[in-house]
Amino acid sequence: MKFELDTTDGRARRGRLVFERGVVETPAFMPVGTYGTVKGMTPEEVQDTGAQIILGNTFHLWLRPGQEIMKLHGDLHDFMQWKGPILTDSGGFQVFSLGDIRKITEKGVHFRNPINGDAIFLDPEKSMEIQYDLGSDIVMIFDECTPYPADWDYAKRSMEMSLRWAQRSRDRFDSLGNKNALFGIIQGSVYEDLRDVSVKGLVDIGFDGYAVGGLAVGEPKEDMHRILEHVCPQLPQDKPRYLMGVGKPQDLVEGVRRGVDMFDCVMPTRNARNGHLFVSDGVVKIRNAKYKDDISPLDAECDCYTCRNYSRAYLYHLDRCNEILGARLNTIHNLRYYQRLMAGLRQAIEEGKLEHFVSEFYQRTGAAVPPITSDN
């Protein structure tokens, strides 16, 4: 993987990730394909929304279908027939989400398989091996996603262990002869001094890109913005920056303003299945009865298949009848909305008009523009 940085506007960056499997224009949003599928979508449909890279889930694909079945097909690309690049998370966040059924030690994490209850152990070395078999174009180190809230002492211990795991991940990745990209993950909760230590430690080890982890886990938005403003200026200019698990459209805008290049989140797909649809001036909750006889398109400015062909009344009808097509049409639209937003941000950076774009974005949704407060 090669990262090319074209231009900047304030802290925002316009560039691209170049892989053997294709080019990803940045800032980029990655749809989430947890089990080897973006829910309800064929790979061609996902590509048609404008997505150039997707995210796969190491933890879930390891448990089911498992490494051996994956290797029978070749790798994850062959298994799911996605032709573009794939980033896989390391399994750290999923282990964090297991709560009481997992035990974290220096060696790794012991937990119960949520599918059948079997005892399982996952460590940095195993995570690197699974992601190698998946053929991931971007591999994520194995870390502990520090929960929120966490006091300073716990956050420090967690961050320091994640740094040791980062070195172990790097060592196993290299010993496998993996020629793809490996990203480090910055931890430290909401504490700037701990984030500083994490950044320095990861940069000293050396990675192909750097992710900001441990955000979007319940902390106030102001803390997320503050940490991004503090961390991003410290990262190498020639490496991509990835904000994990984020987020709402406003979060993407604010991340880009603060220098983030990559995002992922289940929000557009999960919300689509729940009738929560993103449009140019906010949100349409299609289950609301006021859309029963609304013959207008979901979003007159959107060029997706759904908006070009169907009315709000039809989407309301499909949702009321629990028709699978409703969830699919909603998903096509939400994914296209996210890709249109990213394309708009990229163009605004190219033209040096990002803050004008941001101002218009918030004006249309009726919200105030969050300030950027750091002097970094």
Curated annotation (Swiss-Prot):
Protein's UniProt keywords contain Phosphoprotein: no
Known partners and oligomeric status: Homodimer. Within each dimer, one monomer is responsible for RNA recognition and catalysis, while the other monomer binds to the replacement base PreQ1.
Gene Ontology biological-process annotations: queuosine biosynthetic process; tRNA wobble guanine modification; tRNA-guanine transglycosylation
Keywords: Glycosyltransferase, Metal-binding, Queuosine biosynthesis, Transferase, tRNA processing, Zinc
Region feature (RNA binding): 245-251, 269-273
Species of provenance: Erwinia tasmaniensis (strain DSM 17950 / CFBP 7177 / CIP 109463 / NCPPB 4357 / Et1/99)
Family label: Belongs to the queuine tRNA-ribosyltransferase family.
One Gene Ontology term, aspect cellular component: cytosol
Protein name: Queuine tRNA-ribosyltransferase
Binding site for substrate: 89-93, 143, 187, 214
